[in-house]
């Protein structure tokens, strides 16, 4: 396996370097024998009772708080097997994760949850939503779990420190740290079939995220959940972290999770326009306005180019979809668009639910 070969070469190179350093030190010790010999093995063991508690706001303190609330999930089904991560929502077994984690095994797949204390429990799907890539599962027979503290992603700032906790490559309770690299990053991931795309309004982070981190926690330095780790960018044939990870903001994840718990289904905000993911226009070109939809009622015409949602710049269709889906049905947004003759207009649009026509 190429991955293992590369790892083995790295380990050998590291051992050789260490061996070279050890040889040089040993030769110096033999030549210079005039001074006293000091041996670390003879030193007394440190007083473990005097070790200071992790300072508040440190990665260690965050890990101590968050690790018990993050789980590993194994999925086994007729169409495949996989694994991911999840975060505990309730003491009686509700767990938040990604849809693509639980969907990997197909319908009827068996889910097993592994907790940080080494215990396991079977789980069933409460509800899953491919559009938002959010799912909620419930473990059986547990009433003593530690729910994660929910924070807010609305006040996040670029450069703010964050910590990711999950099970990359099955390595449970892995903790990595980084910063918020960008906000409101539209990221397109695969849906349930080739005709459906899930565009998330993502938090971008350089905290190391790898396969298996999906569904895990992105938290602030107080250990509060700010995002659900979902996707990574890769370069060429690489499949590991290159410092470009993406998380679903907790506000969106929380709203969808609550709907899944309450009804088993999720709703998504729409404005009733068709736009290409990308084209030559700087903005989202409206190729079709749905009759009597929110955009139509607000007066947005065909061929308009939407350039802003509230105070957010819209650069293409994906960024428009991400911005709208980050809102709840019934929210009012200010949409700024340009007409083909160059005139710019701002209108209020009340979003509708995509479930209205079901």
What is each PLM-predicted segment?
Residues 124-126, 143-172, 248, 258, ...:
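Active-site substrate-binding loop(s) of clan PA
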Residues 78-84, 101-111, 145, 165-179, ...:
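Active-site loop architecture of trypsin-fold serine endopeptidases
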Residues 30, 43-50, 228-271, 352-355:
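Interdomain regulatory linker/hinge segments that flank or connect interaction modules
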Residues 79, 103-108, 116, 128-132, ...:
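Gly/Ser-enriched beta-turn/beta-hairpin loop segments
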Residues 5-10, 53-59, 74-92, 110, ...:
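A conserved glycine-rich beta-strand in the N-terminal activation segment of trypsin-fold
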Residues 27-33, 76, 91-92, 96-131, ...:
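Catalytic-histidine neighborhood of serine endopeptidases
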Residues 1-36, 255-358:
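C-terminal recognition in membrane/secretory proteostasis and scaffolding
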């Amino acid at each position: 396996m190429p991955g293992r070969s590369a790892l083995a070469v790295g380990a050998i190179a590291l051992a050789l370097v260490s061996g070279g350093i050890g040889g040089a030190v040993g030769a110096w010790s033999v030549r210079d024998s005039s001074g006293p010999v000091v041996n670390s093995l003879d030193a007394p063991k440190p007083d473990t009772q005097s070790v200071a508690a992790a300072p508040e706001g440190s990665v260690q303190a965050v890990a101590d708080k968050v690790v018990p609330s993050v789980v590993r999930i194994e999925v086994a089904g007729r169409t495949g097997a996989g694994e991911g991560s999840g975060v505990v929502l309730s003491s009686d077994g509700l767990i938040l994760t990604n849809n693509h984690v639980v969907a990997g095994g197909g319908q009827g797949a068996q889910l097993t949850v592994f907790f940080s204390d080494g215990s396991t429990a079977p789980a069933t799907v409460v509800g899953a939503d491919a559009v938002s890539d959010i799912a909620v599962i419930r473990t059986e027979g547990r009433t003593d779990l530690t729910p994660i503290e929910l924070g807010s992603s609305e006040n996040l700032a670029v450069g703010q420190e964050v910590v990711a906790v999950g099970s990359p490559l099955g390595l449970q309770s892995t903790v990595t740290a980084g910063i918020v690299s960008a906000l409101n990053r539209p990221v397109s991931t695969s849906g349930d079939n080739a005709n459906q795309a899930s565009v998330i309004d993502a938090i971008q982070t350089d905290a190391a995220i790898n396969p298996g981190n999906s569904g895990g926690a992105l938290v602030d330095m107080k250990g509060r959940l700010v995002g659900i780790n979902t996707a990574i960018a890769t370069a060429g044939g690489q499949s590991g972290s290159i410092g470009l990870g993406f998380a679903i903001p907790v506000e969106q994840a929380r709203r969808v999770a609550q709907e899944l718990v309450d009804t088993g289904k999720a709703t998504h905000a729409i404005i009733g326009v068709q736009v290409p993911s990308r084209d030559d226009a700087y903005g989202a070109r409206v190729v079709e306005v749905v009759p009597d939809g929110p955009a139509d009622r607000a007066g947005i015409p065909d061929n308009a180019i939407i350039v802003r949602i509230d105070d957010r710049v819209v650069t293409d269709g994906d960024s428009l979809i991400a911005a709208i889906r980050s809102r709840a049905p019934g929210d009012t947004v200010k949409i700024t668009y340009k007409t083909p003759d160059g005139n710019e207009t701002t209108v209020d649009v009340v979003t509708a639910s995509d479930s209205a026509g079901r």
